[in-house]
A protein has these predicted regions:
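Accessory cap/linker subdomain of secreted extracellular hydrolases
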Residues: 143-198
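Short beta-to-alpha linker loops that shape the active-site pocket of alpha/beta-hydrolase fold enzymes
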Residues: 13, 65-69
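Alpha/beta-hydrolase active-site loop
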Residues: 56, 77-98
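Short, surface-exposed "cap/lid" segments of acyl-processing enzymes
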Residues: 2-56
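Glycine-rich "HGGG/HGxG" loop immediately N-terminal to the catalytic nucleophile
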Residues: 68-76
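Primarily recognizes the serine-hydrolase "nucleophile elbow" in alpha/beta-hydrolase
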Residues: 92-160
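Solvent-exposed, acidic/flexible segments
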Residues: 3, 40-47, 76-84, 111, ...
Length: 198
């Protein structure tokens, strides 16, 4: 009963290259293609079954490309302010596009990076988007303790996310970039370049 709810999904980590934007996979299980440097890519839509389940239950579904995915610049992995703004702006745009009432209930959902984005959207909603009627949030496994996250993934199969974070913060803060670059050897610089297109 009541106004149709809208669920804004924050996507899980897929990669930092533009080919990893959720909009590049569309509302499909995923897509395959080539990166800017010509290597093969797969964009897997991990959350696809959740989108479909929400739609089947009558919710309006919005899947946000986080800032820097599918557009110029580096994707801002674990930049919680930018992730919050991306989801909150997507909620506003989605309601407007659907001609939905401004007070329609909004929920945020995501896991891992998407969990961090969802948690941040809920946290910043009152300040950044007080016009939205945020009714609920699911934030699964958000990477909120960055030092602990770094320790747990360093040397693992998902270590590239460290490069995503460094690339994103380096683009936004010249001081941070200069401090990091002063500590990197050529192998470290190659790692950051590789992360930027993966």
């Amino acid at each position: 009963k009541g106004e149709r709810p809208t669920i804004v999904f924050g996507p899980s980590t897929r990669g930092q290259g533009d080919q990893c934007a959720p909009s590049r996979a569309g509302m499909q299980l995923g897509s395959v293609g080539l990166s800017k440097v010509g290597s093969p890519t797969i964009n897997a839509s991990y959350e696809y079954s959740f989108y479909m389940m929400a739609l089947r239950h009558g919710a309006r579904v919005i899947v946000a490309d986080l800032i820097g995915l599918g557009m110029p610049g580096h994707h801002t992995y674990v930049n919680h302010i930018e992730e919050a703004h991306a989801l909150l702006d997507a909620a506003r745009s989605g309601l407007e596009l659907a001609h939905a009432p401004k007070d329609a209930p909004i929920g945020f959902a995501g896991y891992s990076q998407g969990g961090g984005a969802s948690l941040s959207a809920a946290e910043y909603a009152e300040r950044y988007a007080p016009d939205l009627n945020v009714a609920g949030t699911y934030a699964g496994a958000p990477p909120t303790d960055l030092p602990e996250t770094m320790r747990s993934i360093d040397g693992s199969a998902i270590a590239h996310v460290l490069g995503y974070a460094i690339n994103g913060f380096s683009e936004r803060s010249p001081e941070f970039r200069d401090a990091v670059l002063a500590e990197l050897n050529p192998r470290g610089i190659d790692f950051l370049h590789s992360a930027a297109t993966s």
